[in-house]
Amino acid sequence: MTTKAELVTAIAEKAGINKNQAKDALEAFIEAVTDSLKSGQDVRLVGFGTFKAVTRAAGTARNPRTGETVNRPASKTARFQVGEGLKSSLNS
């Protein structure tokens, strides 16, 4: 797994910027994606993938320790759909 610090270092090296600038850029990217998803917009990066906000329906879940069935409220979550460019890059 790559950590945020490792990602910042990689961005800084590839973009030829210092780590503080890379950290600011990464945090701005994360904030922009989050804001778009909160407002109901998908974030599509052609060749890489699409971030989507989806609503999970309410339902029931089971407590694994007690076996008790509990109601789970509807909630929103984020999904990432891999783009063809990234998929083919991973499989080459």
Swiss-Prot record:
Membrane-traversing stretches: none
Signal peptide: none
Entry keyword DNA-binding: yes
A cellular component annotation (GO) from this entry: cytosol
Keywords: DNA condensation, DNA-binding
Listed InterPro entries: Hist_DNA-bd, IHF-like_DNA-bd_dom_sf
Any GO BP annotation: chromosome condensation
Gene Ontology MF terms in the entry: DNA binding; structural constituent of chromatin
Coiled-coil features, chain-numbered ranges: none
Disordered as annotated region, ranges: 58-92
SMART domains linked to this entry: BHL
Family: Belongs to the bacterial histone-like protein family.
Assembly: Homodimer.
Annotated function: Histone-like DNA-binding protein which is capable of wrapping DNA to stabilize it, and thus to prevent its denaturation under extreme environmental conditions.
Protein name: DNA-binding protein HU
